[in-house]
């Protein structure tokens, strides 16, 4: 029941955010068709709770391995799930930025959730596609493996994504358990 409480809280927050953005985009021409992706996480009693909408991602970094915890709500991920294309093809697909879910696009939103065990030393990465679209999981893992402060790791992730042609804005959060 505790798990459900945390997930209910997170999905409720997503629904509230969705309503706010949706109402704003419908009441003010300046914000017409406004929408966003979102990923949120909370840690309680050695469990990581993740809620997300769109293609912003959550990863768990443990023992030099990056583990994606989310699955993009995107057109190309639908093709991957159907077996029409591979994950490698999806990364280069012309429609790779077309998302199938977002906050603020409709009056309701479907939020996906994940619960994953965490342990001391794990690093949780939440990021937009400005980062995950430019760096491979292995490249991010290499940076997170460095024996430097967490804020330095974050700065290097952004620098490297920009160096590789980052054309999108980049938001990220790193949390060490």
Where is each model-derived feature located?
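PP2C/PPM-type serine/threonine phosphatase catalytic domain
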Residues: 1-177
């Amino acid at each position: 029941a505790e798990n459900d409480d945390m997930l209910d809280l997170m999905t409720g927050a997503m629904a509230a955010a969705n309503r706010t953005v949706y109402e704003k985009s419908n009441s003010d021409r300046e914000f017409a068709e406004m929408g966003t992706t979102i990923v949120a996480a909370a840690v309680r009693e050695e469990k990581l709770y993740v809620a997300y909408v769109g293609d912003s991602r959550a990863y768990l970094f443990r023992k030099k391995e990056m583990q994606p915890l989310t699955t993009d709500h995107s057109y190309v991920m639908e093709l991957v799930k159907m077996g029409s294309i591979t994950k490698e093809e999806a990364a280069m697909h012309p429609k790779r930025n077309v998302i199938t879910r977002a906050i603020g696009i409709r009056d309701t939103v479907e939020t996906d959730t994940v619960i994953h065990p965490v342990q001391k030393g794990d690093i949780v990465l939440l990021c937009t596609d400005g980062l995950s679209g430019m760096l491979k999981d292995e490249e991010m893992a290499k940076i997170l493996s460095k024996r430097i402060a967490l804020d330095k790791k974050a700065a290097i992730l952004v620098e490297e994504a920009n160096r590789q042609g980052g054309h999108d804005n980049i938001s990220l959060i790193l949390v060490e358990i």
